[in-house]
Structure formats: structure tokens, C-alpha cells
Amino acid sequence: MKKSDKKKLSGEIIKRLAKEYPDAKCHLDFNSPFELIVSTVLAAQCTDIRVNMVMVPLYKIKYKSPKNIIKDGEDNFRENIKSINFFNNKAKAVLSICKTVVDKYNGQIPQTMDELTSLAGVGRKSASVVMGNCFGKNDVIIVDTHLKRVATRLGLIENENPEKIEIELKGIIPDNEQFHFSMRIGELGRQICKAKKPDCEGCFMNDICVSAFK
């Protein structure tokens, strides 16, 4: 599909997503950029539900700031998150993030892509989640498994590599729509366009989707 055709298609998709999911929100529960960046790192290859179950009580009782995690220590933090996949590596990453944030940023989570991705365990996807949800940055594409699957099925992207997908979508989605597009297409992926059994019959995109009913 030509880029001009993809732009036209994306415009219609953006309108439909906005109508269907006007208030799409992050599925990780958080009250601060600190909580979201920690939960985002912990959510890699784990469910948001599990991370919320483990971390929400801990944020309220023990971990109200990066300094609290540093003070508690890596061993205790690891023990508290052991029901989360890959807890050993994630505990190391979170402790590293907390130390960097305290030492370099006066305890505040940085706001730019370069600064965020310099933190341990934080890639472009996690950085985009924090930038969009906490700092009001609309010009971020969150390339997660749902966006990748749904955007491919809709015919918007042809790449497999996350960074190439990001570049491709930034070329056809207006800057001020990119974050909302990411959140809303994620909802479509969770609720209708599922990995194994997409509900094409019940999908509000089935008349413009190149993969519908296939």
C-alpha cells in the first residue's frame, strides 16, 4: 500500500478509534511517574494484572519514592516481587533506575526519550508509556504486541522491527494523535482483534481492514 493510501486509511482508523475508545487508559495502576516507570519495567513479559496485584499495595505501604526502594535493598525488593516473571533481573533494573534517578535527577523521573532510555531496563516502548501517560507527550508511538498485531492486520505497517514500526507509523499518524492512537489501538487488540481468535464479525473496522475474515 502506498504511503498516501496509508495516510488516508489511518485518518479513518483514528476517527473510529476515538469514537469507540475515547477514554482509553493505561492498564497499569499508578499515581506518579515513579510508580509507572517501575511498573512498566516489571510488566515486561508479565501481565499488567499481576503487576498491579503485587505493586499497588507496595506503593501505598512501602515504596512511595525511589529512596524507599533503595533503603529497602535489592534482596527485600526481589522477595516482594518474586511472583512476577524474571524477578531477579527486574529487581536489579529497578534498583539501578532508583539510584540513577536519585543521584542524577534529584529523585524526579526524567521526561525525555534519551534520558528515559538511558535507565536500566527502559526501552523506547516503556519510555513512550511514561512520556504519554505522565508528561502529556502526544508525539509518542507505543509499539507493544497489540499495536504491532492490529496495525499489521489493518495494513498500516509492514515491518517487524519495533523501531522501524515506530518510524513507519510516525510517517502517517499526525504528531498530536500518536499517543492516543497507541492507547486506543491497544484497546482494540485487547477486546476485539485478539491474537488467536479476532472477532472480525463484531469489529467496527471490518469494512476497511485488509485482513478481515481471513
Where are these predicted regions, by residue range?
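Catalytic cores of DNA base-excision repair glycosylases
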Residues: 2-214
